Amino acid sequence: MTISNTIPITPELIAGHGLKPDEYQRILDLIGREPTFTELGIFSAMWNEHCSYKSSKKWLRTLPTKGPRVIQGPGENAGVVDIDDGDCVVFKMESHNHPSYIEPYQGAATGVGGILRDVFTMGARPIAAMNALRFGEPDHPKTRHLVSGVVSGVGGYGNSFGVPTVGGEVEFDARYNGNILVNAFAAGIAKSNAIFLSEAKGVGLPVVYLGAKTGRDGVGGATMASAEFDESIEEKRPTVQVGDPFTEKCLLEACLELMQTGAVIAIQDMGAAGLTCSAVEMGAKGDLGILLELDKVPVREERMTAYEMMLSESQERMLMVLQPEKEEQAKAIFVKWGLDFAIVGKTTDDLRFRVVHQGEEVANLPIKDLGDQAPEYDRPWRECGKPAPLPANLVAAPKNYGQALLQLVGSANQSSRRWVYEQYDTLIQGNSLQLPGGDAGVVRVDGHKSKALAFSSDVTPRYVEADPFEGGKQAVAECWRNITATGAEPLAATDNLNFGNPEKPEIMGQFVQAVKGIGEACRALDFPIVSGNVSLYNETNGVAILPTPTIAGVGLLPDWRKMARIGSANDGDKVIMIGLDGSHLGQSVYLRDVLDSREGPAPEVDLFAERRNGDFVRSVIRNGQATACHDISSGGLAVALAEMAMASGKGLTIDLDECKGAPHALLFGEDQARYVLTVPADVADFVCANAEGAGVPFRRLGTVGGDALVVGDLIALPIQQLRDTHESWFPDFMEGRGELAAE
């Protein structure tokens, strides 16, 4: 059958599909003829960064992905990690950045929908969600509109679907003015012996379309997600998908019910590049060809072309390879749930991806070259220069320490996120044990009296910009520390690597060095990367975002009754710092928000100290000796103490007389591998003796009690004043009140 080409393939059309001239030449060499318009769209979708990872694949292979608990690492819809008793946790984080900037509500909502599908495609029931959000500076004219839309979209979809949002991040910086970041995380629980993969097996088997009908929404979405923005941004609004969480809930239940029947050979959700990507991935992974008949695809719009059907990113859709004898049983399940079920093709043995529409073959391409043998680049990169050292004695001390602390806890980036997370259902399913606002979200595992999972998401972009290698290490270390601070054992992580244009050697250098740092930290902390996502070209008019390699992790609590919270201290408890005295002010929020400076190097991450100190803290919590615990990160010791006091409603009397160094470095330094513990007075000596025996540095800081945070003669702030300052920034900002400077 000859393939006729009705639309001329011009250089402008090729460039409009995000394909470079040498990539188009590669297509001509591969197929020996000019591609059809539909084929051009298929190559464009499969060879862009979003689907092929062509600029990042070389470096992602260097990450540690295996461990004693890892059941499934990268390459599937989500990672799978053993949590004992025949159960496993299935999780992943991925970005929906570009759509969320163009259409914040739907962009964020469908980001949540997509990540939930990745989890339940594997056979897991979602139990927790998180999101890491980055916006432009607060006084930028679009920021409030974007915050409102994204938060509503995340909440609207997650709440309706019925999954608790248990954690996340929200930060502001001028470098996100033109490209916000929406990184969505989901985790689910499955049986370890009942995981479903996307690799097709067997020739001549039916390829089945499941879920909602196909429309024109999202056509070209994957290509848009692999491009820089410019003034034509508003024209891209039609490429944003529209989500329906109630359909997705039905799809979840139908899929899990179908998976019980033994009918499913392979299953893949339709995400980026829709039907194209899901069909190609299933076939290429299984070394099979796929034949699709588009006339059988359920559509909700008239006169859709083959190009539109292949590249539509309509939501709530799945593709499956089915046991033929179970067809009627499978169809009955989907009809019961009010969803479409259509056999749209079959597996073949010719390694071709063939598409037929209205009796005409509109695509006939080598499937491996679209899938796992797509182009891969070793892009040129250069190391980033590092800022000069910044000794603490060269950094000005505040005139008023109490005022400086209030400035930090009431700033755009350190203030309470209550306004955000109160719009999310944090309690649905009835298993949430720790809600947003602490170090990590904690969710009980259904059916077990004591087992729970801890979740955290972290990155400090200002560190990554100053030193991508140390910043990559720090993102992993802080995530590991936040999980540890609940008493959980960190099991594994997922990464969401957000960067600018990889064709610029300095941006590619940030990426390469951050990945090297992430890899080193994951190896040192036994914290493998089991899934992830890369989002490149986050630039507008040549201005790149801050490099933002978000790390989300999962930890296991064998007994949640012994977990620690940040606000559970009792009157009379002793306050102990684990780790060294603060000394590092480079790239600190004190420097940025109080002194309006971005100088100095990122703090160094001593991974041996992280491991030693964290393992000790976890043992104290699991032995039932800690009443509260908090890791020390942005804002240093002062902000950590303030957050613990605000969370517990109990004052702290702190004495720094034994500490060595300048007071502003002790209080606001952001040295790593540090925690604040509170322990009952009668076990304080025992805990300190154990720390000494384990070679863990510690400092006795003071006592819990009263209604104020008192630090020597430097700070004396009533908890209520701290709370009022901490809680007011976000509502004031969203209602357009007060001073809204980000810095």
From Swiss-Prot:
It catalyses: N(2)-formyl-N(1)-(5-phospho-beta-D-ribosyl)glycinamide + L-glutamine + ATP + H2O = 2-formamido-N(1)-(5-O-phospho-beta-D-ribosyl)acetamidine + L-glutamate + ADP + phosphate + H(+). Mg(2+) 1 binds at residues 94, 533. One of its GO terms (molecular function) is phosphoribosylformylglycinamidine synthase activity. The keyword Transcription does not apply. Belongs to the FGAMS family. Monomer. Part of the FGAM synthase complex composed of 1 PurL, 1 PurQ and 2 PurS subunits. This is Phosphoribosylformylglycinamidine synthase subunit PurL. The lineage of its organism: Bacteria, Pseudomonadati, Pseudomonadota, Alphaproteobacteria, Hyphomicrobiales.
